[in-house]
Amino acid sequence: MGSRPRGALSLLLLLLALLSRPASGCPAPCSCAGTLVDCGRRGLTWASLPAAFPPDTTELVLTGNNLTALPPGLLDALPALRAAHLGANPWRCDCRLLPLRAWLAGRPERAPYRDLRCVAPPALRGRLLPYVAEDELRAACAPGLLCWGALVAQLALLVLGLLHALLLALLLGRLRRLRARARARSIQEFSLTAPLVAESARGGAS
């Protein structure tokens, strides 16, 4: 997956996450202290993981849960995030981990994430997640299973393309209306001033 699909996917999921974040700020069953959100050792799985976290989160603790993957865009939706504690989870290294792998690749330091190891599939068991290639993650998907990460990226690009086309159409329509109004105003002003100019010309000739 190239950088453009990831960028479009991240943008779309960022908007969705901001729209769906909990009104209370600190999502259950986590605890919060300032901008630190602690969801560690709460038995969280993909299904029970909070859909979003406060956008000003600077430190997120997900250590010691039952997470095999993270929803795409979950970490990208936290622009202030400086540290994510993700150890002691049974990560399944297949195409579902592509968003997390991309997020890790963008971190300035990989040392804090060297304890992230693949538990499955057998071919990748024990491997350090930050050093598993994207092609290896894609290849780990079951035969015939479309990598939903790539599918979401394509859908995101389609939605963004449609939004851009709609915005362009609205801007062009607005521009046409402004030009039509300016033309009508010019014609109206000319129709008002032309008789005065003609009358002034006749007066000067006499």
UniProtKB/Swiss-Prot annotation:
Instruction: Please tell me where this protein is predominantly located.
Output: membrane
The residue spans the entry assigns to the Extracellular side of the membrane are as follows 27-147
Q: Where is the signal peptide?
A: 1-26
Q: Which residues carry this modification: Phosphothreonine?
A: T193
Q: Which cysteines are joined by disulfide bonds?
A: C26-C32, C30-C39, C93-C118, C95-C141
Q: Which InterPro entries match?
A: Cys-rich_flank_reg_C, GPIb-IX-V_Complex, LRR_dom_sf, LRRNT
| Entry-linked Gene3D superfamilies | Ribonuclease Inhibitor
Stated membrane topology is: Single-pass type I membrane protein
Record bears the keyword Signal: yes
What are the LRRNT domain coordinates in residue numbering?
A: 27-55
Sites of Phosphoserine modification = S186, S191, S200
Extract the SUPFAM superfamilies matched here. Answer: L domain-like
* UniProt keyword annotations, A-Z: Blood coagulation, Cell adhesion, Disulfide bond, Glycoprotein, Hemostasis, Leucine-rich repeat, Membrane, Phosphoprotein, Signal, Transmembrane, Transmembrane helix
Q: Which SMART domains does the entry mention?
A: LRRCT, LRRNT
The cellular location(s) given in this protein's UniProt record come to: Membrane
Q: Which GO terms describe its cellular component?
A: glycoprotein Ib-IX-V complex; plasma membrane
The residue spans the entry assigns to the Cytoplasmic side of the membrane are as follows: 173-206
- Residues annotated as glycosylated are N66
LRR repeats span 60-83
| Ranges annotated as spanning the membrane | 148-172
Domain LRRCT: residue ranges: 89-143
Q: Which Pfam families match?
A: LRRNT
Q: How does it assemble?
A: Two GP-Ib beta are disulfide-linked to one GP-Ib alpha. GP-IX is complexed with the GP-Ib heterodimer via a non covalent linkage. Interacts with TRAF4.
Misc. remarks from the entry: Platelet activation apparently involves disruption of the macromolecular complex of GP-Ib with the platelet glycoprotein IX (GP-IX) and dissociation of GP-Ib from the actin-binding protein.
What is known about what this protein does?
Gp-Ib, a surface membrane protein of platelets, participates in the formation of platelet plugs by binding to von Willebrand factor, which is already bound to the subendothelium.
Protein's name in the database:
Platelet glycoprotein Ib beta chain
Gene source species: Mus musculus
